[in-house]
Design a protein with these regions (language model features):
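Conserved HGGG/HGGXW glycine-rich cap/lid loop of the alpha/beta-hydrolase fold
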Residues: 14-63
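Conserved acidic catalytic loop of the alpha/beta-hydrolase fold
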Residues: 73-90
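Gly/Ala-rich beta-loop-alpha elbow adjacent to hydrolase catalytic centers
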Residues: 94-98, 102
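Flexible "cap/lid" loop of the alpha/beta hydrolase fold
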Residues: 116-147
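Alpha/beta-hydrolase
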Residues: 136-222
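Short beta-strand/loop motif that positions the catalytic acidic residue
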Residues: 227, 233-235, 239
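Conserved alpha/beta-hydrolase "acid-adjacent" motif
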Residues: 240-246
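Catalytic active-site module of serine/aspartate enzymes centered on a nucleophile-bearing elbow/loop
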Residues: 257-291
Length: 291
């Protein structure tokens, strides 16, 4: 399900907001879209947070900038979203490929960002690993996306195990145990299955995905040393999508940051891990203390 297209000073954006309380902008990863943002923000209670979720440029209903498809333009679009909603200052919750524009927003408009949560986030030059033939089919074709949806309904455990193995280095008994743990937890199972429907690199996500790959490979510096807000970094040590080195190096440069390392955590650890509920509660507390 899509969302309204809102006109801002920096361009059109697919956008929705709900809840009341501390404003939080949710910046999805690569690939993704507003549906991925909804899966990300499910841990934020609507009676405590004003949740602002969107599709980044090139994903679903948000077009790429006609003249500027840069990371900085995306950061300016996030600021324009705040303007359009009458929000002076907000926290930002970014995952994976949402990291670069979130960091640049904090650099370019520091007065607008109260705090930043960066989960398994890209923080420097990044080149995505070459996809396998099976990944090209599953994520890059309509037939592959249909198959993932079919399996999510008929064999959800297979989808969950595939997602965990594809996003981390754990194997064998550890993978089986983690899969069983996720399948036994309704929230974690639902989160992984929701994300599985948002990771296509074709169709309405293709332009955003290809733009992200080009932009991330060309990163020189995101100027993290200029970020002035408190930053909470969260990363799984077994992440094979965005290596934990990205968060270690960001933590070393950011003026005010905390780093939580999730033992044997995959790229999905914030949502699918034995410690996920505890980490999510720490994140809510961080937002409340730095709003």
């Amino acid at each position: 399900m899509g969302a309204p297209i809102v006109k801002t000073a920096a361009g059109d954006v697919e956008l929705e907001e709900r809840g009341r309380g501390t404003p939080v902008v949710v910046v999805h990863g690569s690939p993704g879209g507003i549906d991925a943002g909804r899966a990300m923000d499910r841990f934020l209670p609507e009676d405590r947070f004003r949740i602002i979720t969107l599709s980044r440029p090139g994903y679903l209903g948000t077009p790429l900038g006609a003249d500027d498809a840069s990371i900085d333009h995306e950061a300016d679009l996030l600021a324009a979203v705040l303007d359009s909603l009458g929000v002076d200052r907000a926290s930002v919750f970014a995952w994976s490929g949402g990291g670069p524009s979130a960091y640049r927003l904090a650099v370019r408009q520091p007065e607008r960002v109260a705090s930043l949560i960066a989960v398994a986030a890209v923080s420097a030059r990044y080149e995505a690993p070459a996809p396998s033939a099976s990944d090209r089919f599953l994520f890059g074709t309509g037939a592959g996306q249909w198959l993932i949806g079919f399996l999510a309904r008929r064999a959800p455990g297979q989808v969950v195990e595939g997602a965990l193995s594809g996003e981390g280095s754990i194997r064998g008994d550890e993978l089986k145990a983690l899969t069983a743990s996720v399948m036994a937890d309704p929230e974690q199972r639902a989160a992984v299955l929701a994300f599985s429907a948002t990771v296509g690199t074709n169709g309405a996500r293709k332009a955003g995905w290809e733009n992200d790959l080009a932009n991330f490979a060309a990163i020189g510096s995101l100027e993290l040393d200029r970020v002035r807000c408190p930053v909470l970094l969260i990363h799984g040590e077994a992440d094979t999508d965005v290596a934990i080195d990205f968060s270690h190096s960001a933590h070393a440069v950011l003026p005010e940051s905390q780093l939580i390392v999730m033992n044997q955590g995959t790229h999905l650890a914030f949502y699918a891990d034995p410690n996920a509920a505890d980490i999510q509660e720490k994140t809510r507390a961080f937002l409340a203390a730095n709003s």
